[in-house]
Swiss-Prot record:
Protein known as: Prephenate dehydratase
Catalytic activity reported: prephenate + H(+) = 3-phenylpyruvate + CO2 + H2O
Pathway: Amino-acid biosynthesis; L-phenylalanine biosynthesis; phenylpyruvate from prephenate: step 1/1
Domain ACT: 203-280
Organism of this sequence: Mycobacterium tuberculosis (strain ATCC 25618 / H37Rv)
GO molecular function term, any single one: amino acid binding
């Protein structure tokens, strides 16, 4: 049985993302009847369970369209024993503002919210519950639990969590931006990446020596090969003030020749490169990397001992005429 830790408790958007991954066949060697879901209190705890051997995979949020990257996930991937991403899925996210049955907005003095969720409904709360004292929650489901336990008057949560805790909605479909989406990833211990699909993402963490032009030179290795970078983000190393790691996402797979060549070149330039994986994205995340080019075919002919193709210059053609 495959054990998957996820940001819990039951009823989170992360659980919904995990259900979608399983249904889409993105979880290796499993099916609905061969899966043990393990809710934990945070994304770092889910990743720690994989590192410790308590889980085979972790399903965690990594990015949302309103507040950007989920920093606890990024930081946990950058440090400790290396882990690898094997799959992703994206959910359209809207929230419910919930209370105990029989309560209304006038009763709300305190409100629990997962910080990522609070950022996505900030304007709505300011307009409709401006006097509510915001209390942090470990997850959207934990926010609902706090209402059920009488710790707060209301919560920002998922419809699934609201139903599981028997809560009433003051408002459904709440989100400041109508196109709010959150991306979730499936993370496990290092292994062979999923097969190239032609719609893939590759991610790495770069540790670059503090020298003039070093970052530009590293990133140029992708640009000169026609590789589409979809995310560049810095995070502190946590070892010395003013030193940073750089998260880089690109379109393509490690089995794409252009991506492989770029990774090799970056490895030569950087103090360290942590490969986070290559995995399918479903819809293409950007411009696909170029296929094998003429220079590669030329090199392959040389290695095989085949004769070189003779190039005919326009001047030569005129002379022959």
């Amino acid at each position: 049985m495959v054990r998957i830790a996820y940001l819990g408790p039951e009823g989170t958007f992360t659980e919904a993302a995990l259900v979608r991954m399983v249904a889409a066949g993105l979880v290796p060697e499993t099916g609905p009847d061969a899966l043990q879901r393990m809710p934990v209190e945070s994304a770092p705890a889910a990743l720690a369970a994989v590192r410790d051997g308590g889980a085979d995979y972790a399903c965690v949020p990594i990015e949302n369209s309103i507040d950007g990257s989920v920093l606890p996930t990024l930081d946990s991937l950058a440090i400790g024993v290396r882990l690898q991403v094997f799959a992703e899925t994206t959910l359209d996210v809207t929230f419910s503002i919930v209370v105990k049955p029989g309560r209304n907005a006038a009763d709300v003095r305190t409100l629990a919210a997962f910080p990522v969720a609070a950022a996505q409904v900030r304007q709505w709360l300011a307009a409709h519950l401006p006097a509510a004292d915001l209390r942090p929650a470990y997850s959207n489901a934990d926010a609902a639990r706090q209402v059920a336990d009488g710790l707060v008057d209301a919560a920002v949560t998922s419809p699934l969590a609201a139903a599981r805790w028997g809560l009433a909605a003051l408002a459904d479909g709440v989100v400041d931006e109508s196109n709010a989406r959150t991306r979730f990833v499936l993370v496990g211990r290092p292994g062979p990446p999923p097969a190239r699909t032609g719609a893939d993402r590759t991610s790495a963490v770069l540790r670059i020596d503090n020298q003039p032009g070093a970052l530009v030179a590293a990133l140029a290795e992708f640009g000169i090969r026609g590789i589409d970078l979809t995310r560049i983000e810095s995070r502190p190393t946590r070892t010395e003030l003013g030193t940073y790691l750089f998260f880089v996402d690109c379109v393509g797979h490690i089995d794409d020749e252009a991506v492989a060549e770029a990774l090799k070149a970056v490895h030569r330039r950087c103090a360290d490169v942590r490969y986070l994986g290559s995995w399918p994205t479903g819809p293409a995340a950007g411009a696909q990397p170029p296929l094998v080019d003429e220079a590669s075919r030329w090199l392959a002919r040389l290695r095989a001992g085949k004769p070189e193709q003779t190039l005919v210059r326009p001047d030569d053609q005129g002379a022959q005429a």
